Amino acid sequence: MRWMLRAPAFGLAFSILSWSSSQGPLAGAAASTELTVVGRRNATPTVAADGAFVAVAWGGAEASGSTDIFAAVSRDGGRSFGAPVRVNHVAGDARVNGEQPPHIALVSRPHRDPAVVVVWTTKGEQGTKLLQSRSDDGGRTFAPASLVPGTDAHGNRGWQAVAVDSRGRVDVVWLDHRELAHDTSMAASHHDHKAAGKPDGVAMAQRSKLFIGSLDGSLAPRALTGGVCYCCKTAVVTAGDAIYAAWRHVYPGNVRDMAFTLSRDGGRTFAPPLRVSEDKWVLEGCPDDGPAMAVDRQNRIHIVWPTLVAGASAGAEPNIALFYAMSIDGTRFSPRERIPTEGTPHHPRLVIGADNTMTIAWDELANGSRQVALGRAAIDSDGRPRIRREALGASGSGVYPALATAAGSVVAVWASVSSDASSIQVRRLAAAGPVGTGQ
């Protein structure tokens, strides 16, 4: 179907918005929907769900590069969606990409639609900041944006992740480069994704921080550690009073491996950073490819990430592979296990259903194009999954997937982009509802 609508009034003139939504039959119980704001490059989606209420946010760029944030909601588990609404009141103020998309979260409320919260990166004269906006009418309108507490300092920040705790507090982790703001050459290197200066890139990386805070300010923003890899997405999960965070860390020798920390007291204190796996990926720059994480019903922590591995045979070039590890208590992780892929994998996401069914999504390069693929597994009694690869079978290119569990299924979203068209694809997959999940 194709829609023409006027966006909600923001106190200023706003042009007619055209969008389309199409649905097509799939095998089995799966169903798909396409979300498109016509005339925009639709990309960088995220998704959240609360029962049958599903919300998708994404960036829509004009030909000039000016980018806005859009959101659309479903009340039937992702089978159909209403017309998208522009989230940001200031036209073109978004600065988003695949590793720092607009993140959407839902805050449960009894006997009514959940509150819809969106967090995104915006441009500023002194660097980038994080903005937040909230809808209390089921995604029909959004309040004027406000700054995420702690993100108004000079310098660049972003690569954020969000999670909602059991009390409805929305927690955010992000990478923050305020300590590099005085060095314009270093600030430029972050935009170019280059190594953090020479001769001592590790020492410079210590000036880049992992921050945490809450949207309402009740969890005061603060740095948890330095030494973060500058342009890789982060991951955060909440479960009960616990907060779990994961990121790519810069270890001595410019080694860029996964790190993890947790709080068991609602964010008041955090454990020292823990290395997830000694992959020893040496890189003079940022791979733009961070971790995904979820927590199951037994509070076991599951992490998926990409890293560089040696070629399969003598003389073969190194290549990127996708790995999985699990921790029972957050003090150490199991040896990594390789996830089966059929191309070069990037940009993983992960959710776990109420029945401890795990779904992983990533995009992989094969035969000259990127396609979205899945890893599915039932978690054994010892906490270990047996992961099998499944192709989504989507036509066209697919990049930067995201996942949520909704009403007994998993909802997968991704961007489908070609030379003359772009859309956000939404597909329902047979599975169970959420436990502890994050983005």
Q: Locations of the language-model features?
A:
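Bacterial N-terminal signal peptides that target proteins for export
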Residues: M1-A9
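Bacterial Sec-dependent signal peptides at the C-terminal "C-region" and cleavage site
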Residues: P8, L12-S32
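Extracellular, repeat-based ectodomains that mediate carbohydrate processing or recognition
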Residues: G24-Q439
